[in-house]
Curated annotation (Swiss-Prot):
Extra remark: The porphobilinogen subunits are added to the dipyrromethane group.
Any Gene Ontology biological process: protoporphyrinogen IX biosynthetic process
Protein's UniProt name: Porphobilinogen deaminase
Protein task: Tetrapolymerization of the monopyrrole PBG into the hydroxymethylbilane pre-uroporphyrinogen in several discrete steps.
Length: 313
């Protein structure tokens, strides 16, 4: 069973390579002697850096090339940040494993200010995420929010060069890259509700590849799977892409799941929020019901306007 080399498709960014090596380590810890080969590749999202993500087109922006490698046999598994995984998969492919989640919160990063509330009016804050932008603008309408693209190192360099007074990044990414010291503070879910699946690593493979699926089975983290299942069910019901102003965060308290979600207008003028508590075994249904509640409260109109402005989504 271990004589076949498992090939991992991954993006070439430092964070993506960290995730691929992380999965490699888990696989080899569970299956000593297993041979693994990384297949680094460049995605469309890595190439187009001069356009806001929402306008490039959010569906599969960072995963399509990896999925093509699975379909044509160049790779056996693809490792993704769950927040980048589209709501639908190509025929024959699927998400089979979700690894244990790292801290899902957003990080406030600044060279001179300790807290978002400390920023003077007119300060420039960098983020390309519509989800982060709408929450920032609701809380601090006096700030200037500008797009910020590139890998983590590039973004930090732009901050250090004085292009921004602060930037918002994922806590998980900074921790994984050994850059935890750059975090001024981790923003609470009340302050900045995370993205669907943020902080979790997902593994995609061919659904008919039973050998690979058996190898991956021990890597699945059930608690993380339930939380991400609820978040993704909500997003699927909303027909949300990866680059839309949707936040969702599920927490497990014993056997009880607490799911929070929001849909916001990018300018911060409207914010629809909701939450659900229920049995963890009903995670998917809770996500669907919460999405229906948000839609009934006006989320449909907000998202329609976003898609009109960003038809590529």
């Amino acid at each position: 069973m271990l004589d076949k080399i498992i090939r991992i498709a991954t993006r070439q960014s430092p964070l993506a390579l960290w995730q691929a090596h992380y999965v490699q380590h888990l696989l080899q810890a569970n299956h000593p002697g297993l041979q693994i080969e990384l297949v680094p590749m460049v995605t469309r999202g890595d190439i187009i850096l001069d356009t806001p993500l929402a306008k490039v087109g959010g569906k599969g922006l960072f995963v399509k090339e990896l999925e093509l490698a699975l379909l044509d046999g160049r790779a056996d598994i693809a490792v993704h940040s769950m927040k980048d995984v589209p709501i639908a998969f190509p025929e024959g492919l699927g998400l089979v494993t979700i690894c244990e989640r790292e801290d899902p919160r957003d990080a406030f990063v600044s060279s001179h200010y300790a807290h978002l509330d400390d920023l003077p009016a007119g300060s420039v804050v960098g983020t390309s995420s519509l989800r982060r932008q709408c929450q920032l603008r609701e809380r601090r309408p006096d700030l200037i929010i500008r797009d910020l693209r590139g890998n983590v190192g590039t973004r930090l360099a732009k901050l250090d060069n004085g292009d921004y007074q602060a930037i918002i990044l994922a806590v998980a990414g900074l921790k994984r890259l050994g850059l935890e010291n750059r975090i001024r503070y981790a923003m609470s879910a009340e302050e900045s509700l995370p993205a669907v699946g943020q902080g979790a690593v997902g593994i995609e493979c061919r659904l008919d590849d039973d050998h690979t699926r058996q190898l991956l089975a021990p890597l699945n983290h059930r608690h993380t799977e339930l939380r991400v299942c609820a978040e993704r069910a909500m997003n699927i019901r909303l027909e949300g892409g990866c680059q839309v102003p949707i936040g969702s965060y599920a927490e497990l308290e014993g056997d009880t799941l607490w799911l929070r979600a929001l849909v916001g207008a990018p300018d911060g003028s409207q914010m629809i929020r909701g939450e659900r508590r229920g049995p963890a075994a009903e995670a998917e249904q809770m996500g669907i019901e919460l999405a229906d509640e948000l839609l009934s409260l006006g989320a449909r109109e907000i998202l329609a306007a976003v898609y009109l402005d960003n038809p590529a989504r």
